[in-house]
Amino acid sequence: MTASAPVITVDGPSGAGKGTLCKALAESLDWRLLDSGAIYRVLALAALHHQVDISTEEALVPLAAHLDVRFVSQNGQLKVILEGEDVSNEIRTETVGNTASQAAAFPRVREALLRRQRAFREPPGLIADGRDMGTVVFPDAPVKIFLDASSQERAHRRMLQLQEKGFNVNFERLLSEIQERDSRDRNRAIAPLVPATDALVLDSTSMSIEQVIEQALAYAQRILALPLKK
């Protein structure tokens, strides 16, 4: 890890637009990208590939510590590369999700993945997408953004996404699920979902994604005097 490499952290609840913003920032600045939300799924998939016993913390820790993963944004699409292979779709399966939940229960695995995430900090810089990037993982990041939106707006966005994929969805159920997750995330004892005290808080409820990207880029450039990728 190169502590002097700048980091832009983007935290916030699901559906606020963090992923889209982070991909745009990474492409505009030509920086590395970290999708912390995918880390446990990548670890789970690696464990399945290498037939590591997911019920044993001792077996998972070395795998977590040396996880060979990269996140690449190309034309607005995020690719998750595990050991040189594109696993963007594979990490989204139910089996991988269940395995990830088991792995996340181990304290030493969480600590190993925390160190692994910090190792992404390399020149020219890092865009870190998550929920506690600015408060826990990179508390010294020079640029911190907390991207929020109303629960109603986030439920509406999620409904449109699912409908585009051909799913019939109930708005009230989606809204209830989002509000329940918000409550858990904001009130948990360890690493609650809150803005860092020095974060720029952007409410995207009534903003287009283009406006969000423009404001975030302007803020980062003002603090870091960054050139845009040509």
Curated annotation (Swiss-Prot):
<dbReference type="GO" id="GO:0005829">
    <property type="term" value="C:cytosol"/>
</dbReference>
<dbReference type="InterPro" id="IPR027417">
    <property type="entry name" value="P-loop_NTPase"/>
</dbReference>
<dbReference type="GO" id="GO:0036431">
    <property type="term" value="F:dCMP kinase activity"/>
</dbReference>
<dbReference type="InterPro" id="IPR003136">
    <property type="entry name" value="Cytidylate_kin"/>
</dbReference>
<dbReference type="GO" id="GO:0036430">
    <property type="term" value="F:CMP kinase activity"/>
</dbReference>
<protein>
    <recommendedName>
        <fullName>Cytidylate kinase</fullName>
        <ecNumber>2.7.4.25</ecNumber>
    </recommendedName>
</protein>
<feature type="binding site">
    <location>
        <begin position="12"/>
        <end position="20"/>
    </location>
    <ligand>
        <name>ATP</name>
    </ligand>
</feature>
<keyword id="KW-0418">Kinase</keyword>
<dbReference type="GO" id="GO:0015949">
    <property type="term" value="P:nucleobase-containing small molecule interconversion"/>
</dbReference>
<keyword id="KW-0808">Transferase</keyword>
<keyword id="KW-0067">ATP-binding</keyword>
<keyword id="KW-0547">Nucleotide-binding</keyword>
<dbReference type="Pfam" id="PF02224">
    <property type="entry name" value="Cytidylate_kin"/>
</dbReference>
<dbReference type="GO" id="GO:0005524">
    <property type="term" value="F:ATP binding"/>
</dbReference>
<keyword id="KW-0963">Cytoplasm</keyword>
<comment type="similarity">
    <text>Belongs to the cytidylate kinase family. Type 1 subfamily.</text>
</comment>
<dbReference type="GO" id="GO:0006220">
    <property type="term" value="P:pyrimidine nucleotide metabolic process"/>
</dbReference>
<dbReference type="InterPro" id="IPR011994">
    <property type="entry name" value="Cytidylate_kinase_dom"/>
</dbReference>
